[in-house]
Amino acid sequence: MPIAQQKDNYSPSCQFASIPNDEIFIHVLAPYLETSDNNINYYYDFSQSISEYTKTFQDLNIQWKWQPVTMLTFHEVIDNITEEKNKTGKLPIILNLCDGDEINGTPGISVVKKLHEKELIYTGSDEHFYRITTSKIPMKKAFDEAGVSTAKWESIPSKDHKINGIFNDLGSPIILKPSVSGGSMGVGIKNVVENKQALEEQVKLMFEGYRGWDLSIDGIVAEQYISGREFTTMITGSAQFPELCKVYKPVERVFHASLPDNEKFLSFDRLWEIYEDETPMPDNDNFYEYQEVESVLSTAIQELSLAAYKSVGGTGYTRVDIRMDEKTGRLFILEVNAQCGLSEDEDYTSIGAILRVNNTSFTQMITEVIEDALIRKATQWD
């Protein structure tokens, strides 16, 4: 199916629609982290999500349960789901929101492996997609191997790594990112560097971590900084069934006009409104706004996004971030995000803006995500 032919009137196939509502029970697994750090607590505040899922499953008239899990409890929680299935006879469907790297105490890949081991139906990333996108390094390698346009990059595996010639290879400026990180953690305006001294100083700071949070796992990625417009889109479905993937029309993230070009990106301080090292926008304006993308460019972004998704063997759903070089007009994939945050609230995640532009409700999108999980499981059974 051509990407331009969006499933604007998407309805679930017989997989989900054919199962009576009273025979289904949805278990929403959410990562929980015990910490006294308010900044990190803010990042893991799911009160908005609970409200949205409450409404969604009321709309669908399906029983559900919100189940926080930690690295210490996920085995028991999943085992209990299996036991409950045997007692009630209801079909458990796991809406898995766990997105942690497990280095810093938040559950992630182990939950996926456990769900697979128990042969449960679960949404989102499988083990391969989770692993290849947890670190930017294997993800970038996959882009390069598939010929997917991405910014030039190099790995800095340790604080003692020799970085001579890196500006000759990547150009200037360079942006430094933790290889393993989510929600822009470890990324700030000082990460954009234009000379060797600034680069060495920032690398040293990054290897020291953030508030006890280790950001050095798998090192640091030094990347050509693409100055220009930024876009983001969403895909539901799995790369093994590209004809069933829904590639949403993208939105442009338009940063505040007062910002210089080398600050027009999602820094942790400004994204989460912490303002420890960076300043808010003048007159309390928004850091950025979302707007629709012109049709021809939108199609090009959708095509590139699907190619990137396929290159990493994407499953379930994803958010794809893209930049366009202001001088050449060339599009570059920044990253493909497995287990991205799901919300219709634009203040929480760009998914909300994407849903708005595509005239899609949160309930409809969640239905697509669940439908994909059922299709994948049905394929395994066949």
Residue ranges and their predicted role:
Residues W64, I121-Y122, T150, I174:
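Hydrophobic beta-strand scaffold residues
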